[in-house]
Every structure is written in C-alpha cells, then in structure tokens.
Amino acid sequence: MSFENAVIGATASSLANIAVYPLDLAKTLVQTQLKDEFVEAGEEAGEERAGSRRQNRIKPIALRSPQAAEQYKGALDALQRIYGAEGVAGLYRGLGSSTVAGFIQSFSYFFWYTLVRKHYFRLKQARGGDARFSTPEELVLGIVAAATSQLFVNPINVVATRQQTRGQAAGAADMRTVAREVHAENGWRGFWAGLKVSLVLTVNPSITYATYERLREALFPTPAAASHLVDSAALLSPGQNFVMGVLSKIVSTVLTQPLIIAKASLQRSGSCFQDFHQVLHHLYSTEGPLSLWKGLGPQITKGVLVQGLLFMFKGELTKMLRKLMFYLALLRSSRRALKG
C-alpha cells in the first residue's frame, strides 16, 4: 500500500508541476534576483559604489556570471521576456531535471509518509487511545517523511534550479553539463547547497498536509477508521480535493516564504551566498523586511495550483487504480471458475 501511494502521489505531483512549469520558472527568477544597487560582477564586486545612497551600509554581492544580475519587474515580465528571447522552449528550460527531482522527492515523501503514518496509527490503536492524529503528530510525521526524501533529491534540485536561472547569455545546458559545472565550482559539496534550509523547509509539506487533514475533518468529516486507513484524497470529490489543496498550500506558503527564497538563492546559477542566514540578512539589510516575501504572488499562485491539482489527480488516480485492481481480481476469479 505504501508503494502504491508513493507511485500515485509522485505521478500526480509530476503532472501538476508540468502543468504550471512556466510559472515555476518565473517565480524562481523573480525570487532570486537582487536589486541593481547592490549587485556587481567581476573584480569590482565588494567595493563601494559611487553615488549609492547605501554605500556605507552594505557591500554588493559578487555574482559569478553577468546573467545572474538580470532584472525582471515581476513574473509576467519574466515570462514575456523569456518567450520573446527564447520562444516556448525557453519557458520550459530545466523541465526534465525539475520533473525528475519532483518525482523522486514526491515518491520518497509519499512512501515514508504513508508508511510511518500507517504504523503509528496501528501503534495508537494497540495502546487503546484515540486513533485520530493531533496537529502536532501530523506535523512530526510529515517532517520525518519530508526530511528523508530531501536527502535523496537535493542534488537534482541544485541542477534544476541552475538550469532555470542560467539565462539566455549562458545558453541552454542539459543535466550532465550543469552537474559538471556544479562539481567544477564547488566539488561534491556543491550538490548539497541549500540542504540545511531544505531540511528546515520540510515543515512546508508538513504544514500543508496537516492543514489539509484538519480542514477535511472540519468540512468533510468521515469515520475515524476510514479516514486513517484509506487515502484521505480518495474520500473526496475532485472539486473538494482541489479546494482543500489550495487552502492548505496558502497557509504553508505564507509561513515559509523567506526560507523558500533563501533556498532558491543558494542554489541559483552564479550565487556566492554561503548559507541561508547570509541570504536573509542581505535581503533584510538591503531591501527591507518585505523582500523576504518577494515573489509571494507567483509562489502562492503556482503552489496552490500545483497542490490543488496534486490532490485532485491523486484522488482520481487512486480511484482508477482501485477499479483496475477490482477488475483484475474479478478476471482472476472468472478464470479460476472456468478452470474449475
């Protein structure tokens, strides 16, 4: 059952991410760009800039490549300029590695989440206590599953983010080429850039799924045994799953947006940030506290669409799989009857 849930969850997640990939690309570019006033490239990086009103407060951040300083007014501007310069293909640069990373991460997450949740549920039943999970329990179960999956997928996430943020000047590159660039610049350690903040961000899907379960129990209550032994998404209609997914993702995104920005900034092409504390400090010092939530609009739009589609696809794929298994069982039974 854990393997089936993992395959269904990963497939649903991949389909949802492919559907909104251009928006994901745009929000990554918007989130990782720095203001011109605080960006320099080449040997002048780190020196005070003449005429800058803040030259005594902050030093510019060095970037390894000129395209890393490209500025966009917003997600729509990014999409229009990428399409104008690179065509439709430009809107899907990095799609392959991003889809692979998403599938592996989702598969691992759903596998461990289902497995841990099922065994913990049985343990609670054996002790004779309330079989329902509390919100803290849902969060802990989700964090354990997400942290485990992140260990496997971080290197692919680094490659995917670099492909997204290379820019037209650097040219398109496949996964192998980008992986070689990462290794040449930072060795094997480069593939684990942003791992710490990624582990901290494991609270994001945990908040999402805990919120989903709480909303489902409040708005669409079901018997305790059914809701914990059966995939919750399969108990609701596609529309209900979509609404629950959207609401739960809004909550988790608003709470974790600063960490999402820090992770993307660490993994982007041309970044010289060393850790997520440096990213957050730089953004707060140079652009103010609201910069920690920049790109929140496209992040929420992308996130809620993906989460809504994910729960909808997951619920429908689960129902399809069960129907298929039922028909196969009937077919086997009829064959035995004919042989008998």
Swiss-Prot record:
Annotated Pfam families:
Mito_carr
Per the record, the GO terms for biological process are: ADP transport; ATP transport; fatty acid beta-oxidation; peroxisome organization; proton transmembrane transport
Sorted UniProt keywords: Hydrogen ion transport, Ion transport, Membrane, Peroxisome, Repeat, Transmembrane, Transmembrane helix, Transport
- Cellular localisation: Peroxisome membrane
Q: Give the record's membrane topology.
A: Multi-pass membrane protein
InterPro entries cross-referenced by the UniProt entry: Mitochondrial_sb/sol_carrier (IPR018108), Mt_carrier_dom_sf (IPR023395), Peroxisomal_Ade_carrier (IPR045900)
- The UniProt entry annotates Solcar repeats at 4-119, 133-218, 236-320
Q: Which domain of life is it from?
A: Eukaryota
> Any stretches that span the bilayer, and where are they?
6-26, 96-116, 139-159, 190-210, 242-262, 293-313
User: Which Gene3D superfamilies would you find in this protein's record?
Assistant: Mitochondrial carrier domain
Q: Where is it mainly found?
A: membrane
Query: SUPFAM superfamilies this protein is in?
Result: Mitochondrial carrier (SSF103506)
What GO MF annotations does this protein's record show?
ADP transmembrane transporter activity; ATP transmembrane transporter activity
Keyword Transport present in the record's keywords: the answer is yes
One Gene Ontology term, aspect cellular component: peroxisomal membrane
Asked if the record carries the keyword Transmembrane, the reply is: yes
Job of this protein: Adenine nucleotide transporter involved in the uniport of ATP and adenine nucleotide hetero-exchange transport between the cytosol and the peroxisomal lumen. This transport is accompanied by a proton transport from the peroxisomal lumen to the cytosol. Transport of ATP into the peroxisome is required for beta-oxidation of medium-chain fatty acids.
Q: Which PANTHER family match?
A: PEROXISOMAL ADENINE NUCLEOTIDE TRANSPORTER 1
The text of the family note is:
Belongs to the mitochondrial carrier (TC 2.A.29) family.
Its protein name is Peroxisomal adenine nucleotide transporter 1
Species name: Eremothecium gossypii (strain ATCC 10895 / CBS 109.51 / FGSC 9923 / NRRL Y-1056)
The beginning of the lineage is: Eukaryota, Fungi, Dikarya, Ascomycota, Saccharomycotina
